[in-house]
Every structure is written in C-alpha cells, then in structure tokens.
C-alpha cells in the first residue's frame, strides 16, 4: 500500500480488510454502476483477439486497451468511420460508451487498476498456515496439524457460532466418519442451500471454520490472559518433572503475546488472515500475447487466476444443487471447497502448497505471487533495490587489520572518481585552478596536491558500505574512508558478522551520501562503532573473530614455570637466579620501557604493583586461602597467595599489593582500561546535540568530537589481531626453516 496523501510516500506491506480490497478494486462508472468483480474465467477471444467481458482482461473493469478507444473501436466524439461526430447523448458527456460500457481514457490505467474475485467460500491465506509456527495456530491455541486439517476440510468444527441455537450437541473437532451417521438422519431436512445454513450453525470446515474462530477473538483479553498465565508459569519453573512442558508453554505464550501485540499496534483484525475477496492484479503486470495461429504466450498468473475462477464458479454452482441425499451433497461441497483452497494456495505461494502446478507445454511449475516477489531475482531485490545509482562503486573486500572499527580502506582510484565534484570545488575554492576544465586536467595527472585535498575531504565525509542481500540494518553501515593504494576495499574483520561477509572473494558496494541530512544520519545513526548490539535480542553483533581471540590468547599466555627457574646456580656467581624470576615494576611505563629495550620478554612472569582499592583483589577463586604468612620485626606482615602478595601494616592496613603477571597481560589490561574509560567519560559528560549551522564543517567537527570516545572500543581486538599476525609470521618462519633443512632443492 502506497500512501500518497502525505508529504513522504511509503510502501507498507500488511494485511488489509475485505472492505479495503473492495475500495481498491471497485470503480464507479459515470452512470453510477459499480464494476470490478471478475466472474468470467476466460481471458481473450482468440477469434477477435479482444478481451472477454467480465474476464481477467475485461476493458470495462481494467480500462481500454487503446487510449481513448472503447471496445467497439469507437473514439470519443467520432463516428466509427471517423467522419461524422457521434451525438453526445449516445456517448455520454462523461466519456462512457453506451454500447460496451468502456470509458474513454488513457490505456496506461490498465497498469494500476485492479479487480477482484468474490470467493464463494472463505479461503485461508497460506502464508499464515504453512509457516512454523503457524500464526493462526498461535492465536487460536491449536496444533499446526489440526489447523491444516481444518483448512483442507479433513476435520469439522462443531458449533462454530456459539451465539446461535444448534441441533447437534457436538463439541470440538470431529472427523468425517464421526458425523456420517448423523448425516443420514438429517437427509430429509437438509439439502442444497439449507446445507449452507446448517454448516454455519452446526459443522464448519475449510476457511469458514478458521474465520469463525478468529472473529470471536478479543485480542486484548487474549493478551492479558496469556500474560497472566506466563506469570503463573514463572513461579512453577522449579518443578523438574514438568520443566520441559512448562518451557514449551512459556515459549508459546511469548510468541502469542508478541503476535497479538503487533496486531493491536497495527490495527489489524485477525479474521483478515482469511480471504473473502481475492485481488486481481492489473493486466499490464500479467500480459498475454497472441503470436498467430492461435498460439498464446501469457503470464503464469493468468493460468492461476483462471483455475481459481473456474473452481470458484464450480463451488457457486454446487450451492445451487437441489435434491439428493445430504451426505453426497455435503461431500461434494467439501471437495469443491478444498479444491478452491488449493487453487488460491497455488496462486499465492506454490512452494508451500505441496506439489506445485506445472506448465506441461514448457515442463516447469507455474510461478506464484511469492516466487515473483521473493529471492534474488524477485521484484524487490532485482527491480527496486538492485538498481544502479550514481556516486557508487563496487570492489572486492580484503581484511584490514590496522584499521579501527569505524574505518574502511577505500582504493585511491575509486575515491578520486567518487569525490571528483568535491575535488573540483575545493581546487577552485582554494585557488589552485581557475575553472572546471583545469581542475579535471589536474585530477587526471594525479599530482600530489590532489591527494592532499582528497584527504581533507575524506576527513569529514563518511561512505556507506553495503553487501547484498541487505536483510537487516547491519547490511549497510557508515565508515570513515582511509585511502589505500590497493584496488580492494579494506574492512575491519569484527564488522563482518553483520554483513555476513568473509574474505573469500565477496564484493561490497560503496555509496556516497550527498545531502547534509544523509551525512548527518550516517554520522549519528549508521556508523559501525555505534551499531554494536543486535536490536532483536540485545546480544553483540560486533564480536572479535577467531583470529583476534587467538592473538589475545597468545598475548596473555604465560611461559611455563617449573622449579628450575628459581634454582640457585653456583656456577654463575654473578647471576645466581634467572633475572626475570624476581623482576618487579611499579607502573605501566616501567613495564613498557623494559619491554621495548628487550629486558623482559612478552611471556616471562614478573611482579607488578597493583592499586590498593578497599584492600581486596578479585580473583577467579572465591575466598582464596594464603599459602604463607611472613611477619617482620617492625610489625608488618606479608600474605603470600598463589598469584599475588599483600603487605599490611601493624594496624592491618594494606600497604602494597603485588600481582604475578606477564607483560602481555599488562598490555591487554591497559587496552581494556582505556576502552572502559572512554565509555565512562562519554556517559558522565554527554554532549548536547550540535545546532544546525550553515557551516557544515563546524557541525561535523562537533559530531566527530562526540563520537571519538567510542573509537577506543576496537583497540583490544585490534591488539589481539596484531599479535596473532606476529605469531603466525614466526610460526611460518620456523616451518620454512625446517623445510629448507630437510629439502635439498630449497637449500
């Protein structure tokens, strides 16, 4: 549904009422007649190549085939021969032919004017039946198999309308064999049209049974009842015997609550999931061609609509059958209702309707409505979302381990093409060149000043990266472009989860936001470091990859220790103990300086002075017991644990804490602290939203300052990726060295 009354048009896919379908499909002619219902299964007359009256190509319903011409080949205001004017009284001043009833208008109306088929019996929409779990089964509270048997007339629902008097005293669902004996008794009383009245009151099947149950639903009462039941089940979660049943029931209630809440918010009635009027697409969207010698080439929709119309007409004729025993009439009507349901299923979604109908001439199944709009070649992705647009590019993605989470590597050749208008404006504005022609010549020569100005432009202009298919909002994100000399786009590996991308040849598209509103939206809402959590369940969508985790493991690994490390060595009087066994540092800077000067390795253990906070230290072991107590002559004491020591004064106050750690763990802890510090500063002192100024550079600078604190989030993962690469290089060097030693060819 496209709402064109408002300022901004929008496309909304939702359930609609039968009244709305009638409003879309019916047309009021100038003489006051209402048209729109398709009753004839035929399409065109092969003898005259003209549409059949009241058929799926009728000119009265969908408009004329030729502009300003009716079905009689008569133009508005002219005689059939084109010489004399026809009397206005015969053709109507409003432009309606009295002979064929076709309006004189533009033939393009056949592209958007719809029709409808009035179904003789309600038909359930297949999208809400064959889905697991079924929406209808969730609302009604029955199993999926029972709902399917009701829809396809294998079961009967007793007393569908409880507010009317009934003859039979059945309850619930009944099979065909259970009601056969009662049918024989009611033979003299019920037949023909009386069966319809009997069906509405006593036994219902097919779409009628589903519609009756959905009409009686009160969504708000159902929502409250489901919520109260869910609250009661929360109190019984400790019962082990029924734990699995309780969990299943809780999950079912949660789905029912969500679905009922969505229906209430969208103002949708549940009975709209059962179709009474079937919309017919405009003829131009399902064309038909006659190629001579009665060879017809037509859209699959026409065959499917024809089958629906034929079976609907058969069901209408079945209601008019008079006489005969009740059970034979009932069986015949039940069969016709099932055939109509299957025909509508094949039209809407042949993939879910079981065995799809095939075109025996071309030996392939017919394309249903779902097949046309779904998938990569469907209407949305191929025609609406798959269009080529200006200011866009495309290239292969490769990993960028040196990038921040909000950055992407943009090839220089792509950037200079995308930002060429901005380059020309800046070159002229800064006085480098005098006109556009000189600026283009300068850009073609690729002189250094061009790259310098391009760097300045990229600093305040994000780009959008998109990978098809765009299934959710993480499929297109904004990044700060960084110029690279390669021809591939560099991407941080942590954001690949949202794109569902990997580095095995995947391609991504680059789009350039042009307007000030689009750039603002990219900065505030679409940057990758501001989209870290999944909106569906709150779990992180941006997570460290396996390479990063392995690098962090290598970074924080401690060198294996044994007693030989602390053994006295009398043969070396200058170094009786290993130098790294008793190394002690007081702050981070001392550790980093010693590591840079190669005085200590990454994995060797050392003692590090820790901050005294409440005299405690968190460990992985609760209430850890000291290994040893040491008391000094001045009254101070020292408690020695497995991985740390605590020195206390005579009063019991904690003086110092030393922990046993490594340089790698200190580096990792420092990165984590910086990341948390950036988040805490951002939350404690939130900046106000920048005022919309005329100078966009000032506004973008304020937005950059407000977003810069979050850019430290990816540093720990980046550090892990760095050490993973370093370790992989060392392993590769060792393996190559061993290979050279064993292979005479490489030697």
Curated annotation (Swiss-Prot):
Q: Can you list the disulfide-bonded cysteine pairs?
A: none
Cofactor field: Mg(2+); Zn(2+)
Query: Where is the protein situated, by its record's location annotation?
Result: Plastid, Chloroplast
Locate the residues binding Zn(2+).
Answer: 70, 72, 97, 100
Major location (coarse) = plastid
Q: Which residues bind Mg(2+)?
A: 502, 504, 506
Kindly name one Pfam family recorded for this protein.
RNA_pol_Rpb1_1
Task: Please give the GO cellular component terms listed in this UniProt entry.
Answer: chloroplast; DNA-directed RNA polymerase complex; mitochondrion
Q: Show the Gene3D superfamilies listed in the entry.
A: 1.10.40.90, 2.40.40.20, RNA polymerase II, clamp domain (4.10.860.120), RNA polymerase Rpb1, domain 3 (1.10.274.100)
Co-factor: note: Binds 1 Mg(2+) ion per subunit.
The protein's superkingdom reads Eukaryota
Q: What is its EC number?
A: 2.7.7.6
**SUPFAM superfamilies the UniProt entry points to:** beta and beta-prime subunits of DNA dependent RNA-polymerase
Q: Which PANTHER family match?
A: DNA-DIRECTED RNA POLYMERASE, DNA-DIRECTED RNA POLYMERASE SUBUNIT BETA
Q: What does this protein do?
A: DNA-dependent RNA polymerase catalyzes the transcription of DNA into RNA using the four ribonucleoside triphosphates as substrates.
> What is annotated about its quaternary structure and interactions?
In plastids the minimal PEP RNA polymerase catalytic core is composed of four subunits: alpha, beta, beta', and beta''. When a (nuclear-encoded) sigma factor is associated with the core the holoenzyme is formed, which can initiate transcription.
Please state what the protein is called: DNA-directed RNA polymerase subunit beta'
Native source species? Gnetum parvifolium (Small-leaved jointfir)
């Amino acid at each position: 549904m496209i709402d064109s009354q408002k300022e901004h048009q929008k496309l909304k896919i939702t359930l609609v009422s039968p009244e709305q379908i009638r409003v879309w499909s019916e047309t009021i002619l100038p003489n006051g007649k209402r048209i729109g219902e398709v009753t004839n299964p035929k399409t065109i007359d092969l003898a005259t190549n003209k549409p059949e009256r009241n058929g799926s190509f009728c000119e009265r319903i969908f408009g004329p085939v030729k502009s300003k011409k009716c079905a009689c080949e008569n133009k508005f205001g002219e005689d059939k021969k084109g010489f004399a004017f026809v009397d206005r009284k015969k053709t109507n001043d409003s432009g309606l032919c009295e002979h064929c009833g076709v309006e004189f208008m533009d033939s393009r109306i056949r592209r958007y004017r719809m029709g409808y088929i009035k179904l003789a019996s309600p038909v359930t929409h297949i999208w809400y039946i064959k889905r697991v779990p079924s929406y209808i089964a969730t609302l009604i509270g029955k199993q999926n198999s029972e709902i399917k048997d009701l829809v396809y007339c294998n079961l009967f629902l007793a007393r569908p309308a409880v507010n009317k008097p009934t003859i039979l005293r059945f309850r619930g669902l009944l099979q065909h064999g259970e009601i056969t004996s009662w049918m024989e008794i009611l033979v003299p009383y019920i037949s023909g049209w009386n069966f319809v009245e009997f069906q509405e009151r006593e036994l219902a099947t097919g779409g009628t049974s589903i519609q009756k149950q959905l009409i009686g639903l009160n969504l708000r009462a159902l929502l409250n009842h489901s919520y109260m039941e869910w609250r009661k089940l929360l109190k019984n979660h400790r019962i082990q015997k029924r734990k699995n049943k309780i969990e299943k029931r809780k999950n079912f209630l949660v789905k029912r609550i969500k679905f009922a809440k969505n229906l209430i918010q969208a103002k949708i009635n549940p009975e709209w999931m059962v179709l009474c009027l079937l919309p017919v697409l405009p003829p131009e969207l399902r064309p038909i061609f006659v190629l001579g010698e009665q060879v017809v080439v037509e859209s699959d929709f026409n065959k499917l609509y024809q089958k629906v119309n034929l079976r609907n007409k058969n069901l209408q004729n079945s209601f008019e059958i008079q006489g005969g025993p009740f059970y034979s009439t009932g069986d015949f009507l039940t069969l016709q209702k099932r055939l109509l349901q299957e025909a509508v299923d094949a039209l809407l979604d042949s993939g879910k309707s079981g065995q799809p109908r095939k075109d025996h001439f071309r030996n392939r199944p017919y394309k249903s409505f779902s097949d046309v709009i779904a998938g990569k070649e469907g209407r949305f992705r191929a025609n609406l979302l798959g269009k080529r647009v200006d200011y866009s590019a495309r290239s292969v993605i490769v990993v960028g381990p040196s990038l921040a989470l909000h950055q992407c590597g943009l090839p220089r050749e792509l950037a200079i093409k995308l930002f060429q208008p901005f380059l020309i404006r800046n070159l002229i504005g800064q006085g480098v060149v005098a006109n556009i022609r000189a600026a283009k010549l300068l850009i073609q020569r690729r002189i250094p000043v061009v790259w310098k100005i391009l760097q300045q432009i990229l600093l305040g202009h994000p780009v959008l990266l998109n990978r098809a298919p765009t299934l959710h909002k993480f499929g297109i994100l904004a990044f700060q472009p960084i110029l690279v000399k390669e021809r591939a786009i560099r991407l941080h590996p942590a954001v690949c989860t949202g794109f569902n991308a990997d580095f095995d040849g995947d391609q991504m598209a680059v789009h350039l936001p042009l307007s000030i509103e689009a750039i603002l939206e990219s900065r505030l809402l679409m940057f990758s470091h501001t989209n870290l959590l999944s909106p569906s369940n709150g779990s992180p969508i941006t997570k460290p990859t396996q390479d990063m985790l392995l690098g962090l493991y290598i970074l924080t690994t401690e060198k294996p220790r044994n007693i030989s490390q602390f053994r006295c060595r009398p043969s070396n009087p200058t170094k009786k103990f290993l130098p790294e066994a008793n190394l002690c540092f007081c702050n981070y800077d001392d550790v980093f300086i010693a590591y840079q000067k190669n005085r200590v390795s990454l994995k060797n253990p050392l003692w590090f002075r820790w901050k005294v906070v409440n005299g405690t230290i968190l460990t992985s072991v609760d209430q850890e017991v000291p290994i040893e107590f040491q008391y000094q002559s001045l009254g101070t004491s020292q408690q020695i644990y497995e991985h740390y020591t605590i020195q206390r004064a005579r009063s019991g106050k904690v003086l110092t804490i030393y922990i046993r750690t490594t340089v790698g763990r200190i580096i990792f802890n420092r990165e984590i602290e910086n990341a948390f510090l950036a988040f805490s500063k951002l939350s404690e002192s939130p900046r106000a939203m920048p005022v919309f100024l005329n100078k966009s550079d000032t506004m973008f600078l304020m937005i950059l300052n407000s977003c810069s604190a979050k850019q430290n989030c990816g540093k720990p993962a980046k550090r892990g990726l760095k050490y993973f690469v370093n370790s992989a290089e060392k392993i590769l060097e060792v393996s190559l060295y061993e290979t050279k030693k064993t292979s005479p060819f490489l030697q």
